[in-house]
Amino acid sequence: MITSTSREQSAPSNHPKRSSGIRLPVVIAAIIVAIVALFASVAMSCSSQTKYDWSNLKLENGRMVYYEDGNAVSTTGIDVSDLQGSIDWQAVKNDGIDFAMLRCGRRGSTEGQLYTDKNYYENVEGATRVGLPYGVYFFSQATNEQEALEEAEYILNLINGAGVTYPVVYDQEPVTDSSGRANNLSADQLTKNAQTFCKRIEQAGYTPMVYGNQYDLSRLNIDQINAAVWYAEYTDTHPTSTYHDFVMWQYSHTGKVNGIKTDVDMDILFEASWISPER
């Protein structure tokens, strides 16, 4: 960033100016202007790269809805874990929720142990019983490709025959504990981990997805990962980031839904094409 445009004034010259000459400061100024213009052009290009027209995004009764040609094309979802406790899934469905993303498990951020979410099976049974489609997400703390593959296999065992039709999500976030085992991994390593996970999930016939907010995604070489993006940014207007095109957006962590006693994360899926056949 250029913080000052002041330049020292040179002493008067005894030589006459050449009418066709260009002084060095002028050349430098021209170069600076060109660089600024280039960055402005890139910024404008990045700001317009999203494929969505946010004027078609509406907040209706606390829920985000996306329209195309006057028709609602999005679906409304929630994501839950054992933090929400026992859920009345019939009440959830009756409240207009179209799908759910269930946390199926996590890896410990310090010791690296794999855990199944305490309410996972209860949530699977409840959502299935009322006919509410769902996907799953796993909180990864893998430090290498081998551990990422281990996580993918762990999930595939959990969801085998469970009727998952929505994406299987790789959720890698740094933890506040300074001893977090994956906090200081390089972008290359984090990317390789995500690639390994998503490739295995896709091989098994499910739709892989990567979750993150602006910071989480910036830690990855996201364009090298063959997976959809579930983006997190809490606002009641529209996403402000154009970091990457995403197909699902987590827009609130304080949602109110019948059948759930706590606040809950609210999500919108923009395109139904990301739903896979039941397995």
Question: What are these regions, as identified by a protein language model?
Answer:
Residues 70-196, 202-204:
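Substrate-binding cleft of extracellular glycoside hydrolase catalytic domains
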Residues 201-218:
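Aromatic-lined carbohydrate-recognition surfaces of secreted/lumenal glycan-active proteins
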